[in-house]
Regions:
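N-terminal pre-Walker A segment at the start of P-loop NTPase domains
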Residues: 4-41
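Glycine- and acidic
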Residues: 14-22, 51-57, 119-120, 168-177
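P-loop NTPase motor core
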Residues: 28, 38, 58, 68, ...
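Pre-Walker A (Motif I) flank of P-loop NTPase domains
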Residues: 41-55, 112
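Mid-core helix/loop region of P-loop NTP-binding domains shared across ATPases and GTPases
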Residues: 145-178
Length: 178
């Protein structure tokens, strides 16, 4: 019998940072990052676009779709508190294949605001209850991007629209009209 210590298997873990910090077994799927971005080019040069405008990740239930999407978010997400600081990103992705491509990491790691929504908590006994839960989810996601309100890249109309999306009561008011 071997005295080798084995890492625990992650069960019901759908958060990449949690998976990495709890020292569980992890299959490195970071090469997917480059694969997804391989077909994406700037909007200025549509002639180079090889892929689709839509990416569909299909897997059976409990096969890590949410974890994969969370890995994308963890890699791309800009820090609201300290834009440009990627030290947390480097810590999470230490030892993964993606860090071998410095040019790719410099271009994408920690550079984008990422809107990630999971609908697993948006349920209810009827449409109105489910809609209210969805409004809570959307407003919660929008709250993560409050720092963008100070960005000179948003005009007044975009900021007003963001304010509405961030307001849970505003979002819920649409269900009340039905």
């Amino acid at each position: 019998m071997s005295n080798k210590q084995f890492l625990p298997l992650p069960t019901s873990v759908d958060n990449f940072a949690e998976l990495i910090t709890t020292s569980c077994y992890y299959v490195d799927k970071t090469p997917y990052l480059k694969e997804v971005f391989a077909d994406i080019t700037t909007a200025d040069d549509k002639s180079k676009v090889k892929g689709s405008n839509v990416l569909l990740f299909t897997r059976p239930r409990r096969f890590g779709k949410t974890l994969l999407m969370n890995m994308f978010e963890s890699f791309l997400q800009i820090s609201g508190k300290n834009p440009g600081n990627i030290s947390k990103h480097l810590n999470y992705f230490k030892g993964t294949k993606i860090l071998e491509d410095q040019e790719f990491c410099d271009k994408y790691m920690g550079q984008c605001p990422v809107i990630a929504i999971t609908l697993k908590d948006a349920s209810g006994d009827d449409f109105k209850d489910a809609y209210f839960k969805l409004a809570e989810v959307v407003a919660g996601v929008a709250a993560k991007f409050e720092f963008l309100m100070g960005s000179p890249k948003l005009n007044a109309k975009e900021k007003a629209k963001f304010d509405k999306i961030s307001d849970e009561n505003y979002l819920k008011s649409f269900a009340k009209k039905t």
